[in-house]
Amino acid sequence: MNNRVHQGHLARKRFGQNFLNDQFVIDSIVSAINPQKGQAMVEIGPGLAALTEPVGERLDQLTVIELDRDLAARLQTHPFLGPKLTIYQQDAMTFNFGELAEKMGQPLHVFGNLPYNISTPLMFHLFSYTDAIADMHFMLQKEVVNRLVAGPNSKVYGRLSVMAQYYCNVIPVLEVPPSAFTPPPKVDSAVVRLVPHATMPHPVKDVRVLSRITTEAFNQRRKTIRNSLGNLFSVEVLTGMGIDPAMRAENISVAQYCQMANYLAENAPLQES
Protein backbone atom coordinates (compact mmCIF):
# COMPACT_ATOMS: atom_id res chain seq x y z
CA MET A 1 0.00 0.00 0.00
CA ASN A 2 1.25 3.50 -0.81
CA ASN A 3 1.96 5.14 2.56
CA ARG A 4 1.52 8.56 0.97
CA VAL A 5 -2.21 7.89 0.45
CA HIS A 6 -4.54 8.79 3.32
CA GLN A 7 -8.36 8.82 3.08
CA GLY A 8 -8.04 8.50 -0.69
CA HIS A 9 -5.79 11.56 -1.06
CA LEU A 10 -2.21 11.27 -2.29
CA ALA A 11 0.01 13.48 -0.13
CA ARG A 12 1.81 16.02 -2.31
CA LYS A 13 5.51 16.46 -1.61
CA ARG A 14 5.58 19.94 -3.14
CA PHE A 15 3.03 21.09 -0.52
CA GLY A 16 4.90 19.33 2.30
CA GLN A 17 1.81 17.29 3.17
CA ASN A 18 1.87 14.90 6.15
CA PHE A 19 -1.57 14.09 7.54
CA LEU A 20 -2.19 13.77 11.27
CA ASN A 21 -3.99 10.53 12.20
CA ASP A 22 -3.28 9.84 15.91
CA GLN A 23 -6.47 10.48 17.91
CA PHE A 24 -4.69 11.06 21.23
CA VAL A 25 -2.45 13.69 19.63
CA ILE A 26 -5.43 15.29 17.86
CA ASP A 27 -7.40 15.48 21.13
CA SER A 28 -4.39 16.97 22.95
CA ILE A 29 -3.94 19.67 20.30
CA VAL A 30 -7.65 20.58 20.28
CA SER A 31 -7.56 20.79 24.08
CA ALA A 32 -4.59 23.20 23.86
CA ILE A 33 -6.36 25.33 21.23
CA ASN A 34 -9.52 25.35 23.39
CA PRO A 35 -11.86 26.72 20.68
CA GLN A 36 -14.87 28.71 21.90
CA LYS A 37 -18.02 29.74 20.07
CA GLY A 38 -17.84 33.35 18.95
CA GLN A 39 -14.06 33.31 18.47
CA ALA A 40 -12.59 34.11 15.05
CA MET A 41 -10.88 30.76 14.47
CA VAL A 42 -8.64 30.34 11.42
CA GLU A 43 -6.95 27.11 10.34
CA ILE A 44 -3.96 27.10 8.00
CA GLY A 45 -3.65 23.95 5.87
CA PRO A 46 -6.64 21.89 7.11
CA GLY A 47 -5.64 18.99 4.86
CA LEU A 48 -7.97 16.03 5.49
CA ALA A 49 -9.68 17.80 8.43
CA ALA A 50 -7.99 15.92 11.30
CA LEU A 51 -8.08 19.12 13.38
CA THR A 52 -10.83 20.86 11.40
CA GLU A 53 -13.50 18.35 12.44
CA PRO A 54 -12.99 18.35 16.24
CA VAL A 55 -12.44 22.13 16.30
CA GLY A 56 -15.39 22.74 13.97
CA GLU A 57 -17.67 20.64 16.17
CA ARG A 58 -17.25 23.24 18.92
CA LEU A 59 -17.89 26.25 16.67
CA ASP A 60 -20.62 27.79 14.56
CA GLN A 61 -18.14 29.16 12.02
CA LEU A 62 -14.55 28.32 11.03
CA THR A 63 -12.29 29.94 8.44
CA VAL A 64 -9.74 27.75 6.64
CA ILE A 65 -6.88 28.57 4.26
CA GLU A 66 -5.97 25.67 1.96
CA LEU A 67 -3.66 25.92 -1.05
CA ASP A 68 -4.41 22.44 -2.43
CA ARG A 69 -7.39 22.74 -4.78
CA ASP A 70 -8.48 19.10 -4.29
CA LEU A 71 -8.47 19.39 -0.50
CA ALA A 72 -10.36 22.70 -0.60
CA ALA A 73 -13.02 21.01 -2.77
CA ARG A 74 -13.32 18.10 -0.31
CA LEU A 75 -13.92 20.55 2.52
CA GLN A 76 -16.65 22.36 0.60
CA THR A 77 -18.64 19.13 0.39
CA HIS A 78 -17.86 17.92 3.93
CA PRO A 79 -21.04 16.28 5.32
CA PHE A 80 -21.34 18.26 8.55
CA LEU A 81 -18.60 20.92 8.42
CA GLY A 82 -19.38 22.32 4.97
CA PRO A 83 -21.99 24.91 6.05
CA LYS A 84 -19.75 26.15 8.90
CA LEU A 85 -16.68 26.72 6.76
CA THR A 86 -15.40 29.80 4.99
CA ILE A 87 -12.73 28.45 2.64
CA TYR A 88 -9.93 30.51 1.11
CA GLN A 89 -8.19 28.42 -1.56
CA GLN A 90 -4.93 30.34 -1.54
CA ASP A 91 -1.40 30.49 -0.20
CA ALA A 92 -1.11 31.38 3.50
CA MET A 93 2.30 32.92 2.71
CA THR A 94 0.56 35.79 0.89
CA PHE A 95 -2.69 35.85 2.87
CA ASN A 96 -3.69 39.17 4.50
CA PHE A 97 -4.57 38.22 8.08
CA GLY A 98 -5.07 41.87 9.01
CA GLU A 99 -7.89 42.26 6.49
CA LEU A 100 -9.53 39.07 7.76
CA ALA A 101 -9.41 40.24 11.40
CA GLU A 102 -10.96 43.55 10.35
CA LYS A 103 -13.68 41.71 8.44
CA MET A 104 -14.42 39.45 11.43
CA GLY A 105 -14.34 42.34 13.88
CA GLN A 106 -11.92 40.74 16.35
CA PRO A 107 -8.39 39.32 16.65
CA LEU A 108 -7.83 35.89 15.12
CA HIS A 109 -7.09 32.57 16.79
CA VAL A 110 -4.87 30.85 14.24
CA PHE A 111 -3.93 27.16 14.26
CA GLY A 112 -2.69 24.43 11.96
CA ASN A 113 -0.43 21.52 11.15
CA LEU A 114 1.94 23.63 9.07
CA PRO A 115 3.80 22.29 6.03
CA TYR A 116 7.35 21.91 7.28
CA ASN A 117 8.88 23.15 4.03
CA ILE A 118 7.44 26.66 4.56
CA SER A 119 7.04 26.83 8.35
CA THR A 120 9.83 29.33 9.06
CA PRO A 121 8.98 31.90 6.35
CA LEU A 122 5.29 31.50 7.24
CA MET A 123 6.08 32.31 10.89
CA PHE A 124 7.77 35.56 9.79
CA HIS A 125 4.73 36.39 7.62
CA LEU A 126 2.43 35.86 10.61
CA PHE A 127 4.62 37.96 12.92
CA SER A 128 3.83 40.96 10.71
CA TYR A 129 0.15 40.53 11.65
CA THR A 130 0.45 40.05 15.42
CA ASP A 131 -1.69 43.16 16.01
CA ALA A 132 -4.53 41.19 14.38
CA ILE A 133 -3.88 37.86 16.16
CA ALA A 134 -4.99 36.76 19.64
CA ASP A 135 -3.01 33.50 19.70
CA MET A 136 -1.50 30.81 17.48
CA HIS A 137 -1.14 27.04 17.91
CA PHE A 138 0.99 25.18 15.39
CA MET A 139 2.36 21.73 14.75
CA LEU A 140 5.91 22.24 13.52
CA GLN A 141 9.12 20.33 13.07
CA LYS A 142 10.48 19.85 16.61
CA GLU A 143 13.74 21.52 15.59
CA VAL A 144 11.81 24.67 14.62
CA VAL A 145 9.96 24.71 17.96
CA ASN A 146 13.32 24.35 19.75
CA ARG A 147 14.57 27.38 17.82
CA LEU A 148 11.41 29.38 18.62
CA VAL A 149 11.78 28.87 22.38
CA ALA A 150 15.60 28.98 22.63
CA GLY A 151 17.33 31.50 24.86
CA PRO A 152 20.79 33.10 24.56
CA ASN A 153 23.93 30.94 24.81
CA SER A 154 22.22 28.06 23.02
CA LYS A 155 23.38 26.59 19.69
CA VAL A 156 19.81 26.75 18.33
CA TYR A 157 19.20 30.36 19.44
CA GLY A 158 18.99 32.47 16.31
CA ARG A 159 17.14 35.11 14.37
CA LEU A 160 13.87 33.13 14.55
CA SER A 161 14.20 32.94 18.36
CA VAL A 162 14.75 36.69 18.70
CA MET A 163 11.97 37.76 16.36
CA ALA A 164 9.45 35.24 17.73
CA GLN A 165 10.12 36.30 21.32
CA TYR A 166 10.07 39.98 20.37
CA TYR A 167 6.51 39.56 19.09
CA CYS A 168 5.15 36.73 21.25
CA ASN A 169 5.22 34.70 24.42
CA VAL A 170 6.32 31.30 23.07
CA ILE A 171 5.25 28.13 24.92
CA PRO A 172 6.02 24.52 23.89
CA VAL A 173 2.91 22.35 24.32
CA LEU A 174 3.43 18.79 23.11
CA GLU A 175 5.94 16.54 21.32
CA VAL A 176 4.63 14.34 18.49
CA PRO A 177 6.32 11.24 16.97
CA PRO A 178 6.48 10.56 13.20
CA SER A 179 4.07 7.62 13.66
CA ALA A 180 1.23 10.10 14.28
CA PHE A 181 1.25 11.03 10.56
CA THR A 182 0.60 9.57 7.12
CA PRO A 183 3.10 9.49 5.51
CA PRO A 184 5.42 9.58 8.55
CA PRO A 185 7.83 12.53 8.29
CA LYS A 186 11.54 11.87 8.74
CA VAL A 187 11.65 14.20 11.76
CA ASP A 188 9.99 14.57 15.16
CA SER A 189 7.28 17.20 15.51
CA ALA A 190 6.02 19.42 18.30
CA VAL A 191 3.13 21.75 19.04
CA VAL A 192 3.81 25.33 20.12
CA ARG A 193 1.61 28.14 21.42
CA LEU A 194 2.47 31.74 20.48
CA VAL A 195 0.61 34.57 22.20
CA PRO A 196 1.38 38.07 20.88
CA HIS A 197 2.42 40.41 23.69
CA ALA A 198 -0.40 42.69 24.84
CA THR A 199 2.33 45.15 25.86
CA MET A 200 5.72 44.79 24.20
CA PRO A 201 8.34 43.94 26.88
CA HIS A 202 11.08 45.41 24.66
CA PRO A 203 9.48 47.93 22.28
CA VAL A 204 11.49 49.00 19.24
CA LYS A 205 11.05 52.15 17.19
CA ASP A 206 11.48 50.38 13.83
CA VAL A 207 11.17 46.59 13.60
CA ARG A 208 12.94 46.66 10.21
CA VAL A 209 16.10 47.74 12.04
CA LEU A 210 15.78 44.83 14.49
CA SER A 211 15.33 42.49 11.53
CA ARG A 212 18.44 43.88 9.83
CA ILE A 213 20.62 43.62 12.95
CA THR A 214 19.57 40.04 13.71
CA THR A 215 20.05 39.00 10.08
CA GLU A 216 23.58 40.44 9.93
CA ALA A 217 24.57 39.07 13.34
CA PHE A 218 23.31 35.51 12.83
CA ASN A 219 24.51 35.26 9.23
CA GLN A 220 28.00 35.48 10.78
CA ARG A 221 27.20 33.82 14.10
CA ARG A 222 30.75 32.53 14.69
CA LYS A 223 32.15 36.06 14.54
CA THR A 224 32.16 38.44 17.49
CA ILE A 225 29.71 41.32 17.12
CA ARG A 226 32.69 43.67 17.00
CA ASN A 227 33.20 42.13 13.53
CA SER A 228 29.74 41.01 12.39
CA LEU A 229 28.09 44.32 13.35
CA GLY A 230 31.15 46.54 13.01
CA ASN A 231 29.59 48.34 10.06
CA LEU A 232 26.68 49.40 12.30
CA PHE A 233 28.19 49.94 15.77
CA SER A 234 31.55 51.10 17.06
CA VAL A 235 33.15 49.32 20.00
CA GLU A 236 32.53 52.47 22.06
CA VAL A 237 28.80 52.48 21.27
CA LEU A 238 28.42 48.79 22.15
CA THR A 239 30.36 49.24 25.38
CA GLY A 240 28.28 52.31 26.21
CA MET A 241 25.13 50.17 25.94
CA GLY A 242 26.65 47.61 28.30
CA ILE A 243 27.12 45.08 25.49
CA ASP A 244 30.46 43.26 25.30
CA PRO A 245 31.85 43.57 21.72
CA ALA A 246 33.56 40.19 22.19
CA MET A 247 30.21 38.39 22.40
CA ARG A 248 28.81 36.41 19.49
CA ALA A 249 25.28 36.66 18.08
CA GLU A 250 24.07 33.72 20.18
CA ASN A 251 25.16 35.40 23.45
CA ILE A 252 22.99 38.50 23.04
CA SER A 253 19.53 38.63 24.62
CA VAL A 254 16.31 39.76 22.96
CA ALA A 255 16.37 42.87 25.18
CA GLN A 256 19.91 43.72 24.02
CA TYR A 257 19.02 43.27 20.34
CA CYS A 258 16.08 45.63 20.87
CA GLN A 259 18.37 48.11 22.64
CA MET A 260 20.73 48.06 19.66
CA ALA A 261 17.83 48.45 17.23
CA ASN A 262 16.59 51.53 19.08
CA TYR A 263 20.05 53.09 19.09
CA LEU A 264 20.36 52.57 15.35
CA ALA A 265 16.80 53.79 14.65
CA GLU A 266 17.62 57.04 16.48
CA ASN A 267 21.11 57.58 15.10
CA ALA A 268 21.03 56.02 11.61
CA PRO A 269 17.36 55.51 10.70
CA LEU A 270 16.46 53.46 7.65
CA GLN A 271 15.04 55.40 4.74
CA GLU A 272 11.40 54.75 3.88
CA SER A 273 11.28 52.30 1.00
Curated annotation (Swiss-Prot):
GO cellular component: cytosol
Pfam families: RrnaAD (PF00398)
Alphabetical UniProt keywords: Cytoplasm, Methyltransferase, RNA-binding, rRNA processing, S-adenosyl-L-methionine, Transferase
Subcellular location: Cytoplasm
Gene3D superfamilies listed in its UniProt record: Ribosomal RNA adenine dimethylase-like, domain 2, Vaccinia Virus protein VP39
Catalytic activity: adenosine(1518)/adenosine(1519) in 16S rRNA + 4 S-adenosyl-L-methionine = N(6)-dimethyladenosine(1518)/N(6)-dimethyladenosine(1519) in 16S rRNA + 4 S-adenosyl-L-homocysteine + 4 H(+)
EC number: 2.1.1.182
InterPro entries referenced in this protein's UniProt entry, alphabetically: KsgA/Erm, rRNA_Ade_diMease-like_C, rRNA_Ade_Mease_Trfase_CS, rRNA_Ade_methylase_Trfase_N, rRNA_adenine_dimethylase, SAM-dependent_MTases_sf
Main location (coarse class): cytoplasm
Single GO MF annotation: 16S rRNA (adenine(1518)-N(6)/adenine(1519)-N(6))-dimethyltransferase activity
Record-listed S-adenosyl-L-methionine binding positions: N18, L20, G45, E66, D91, N113
Family designation: Belongs to the class I-like SAM-binding methyltransferase superfamily. rRNA adenine N(6)-methyltransferase family. RsmA subfamily.
Function: Specifically dimethylates two adjacent adenosines (A1518 and A1519) in the loop of a conserved hairpin near the 3'-end of 16S rRNA in the 30S particle. May play a critical role in biogenesis of 30S subunits.
NCBIfam families: ksgA
Name of the molecule in the record: Ribosomal RNA small subunit methyltransferase A
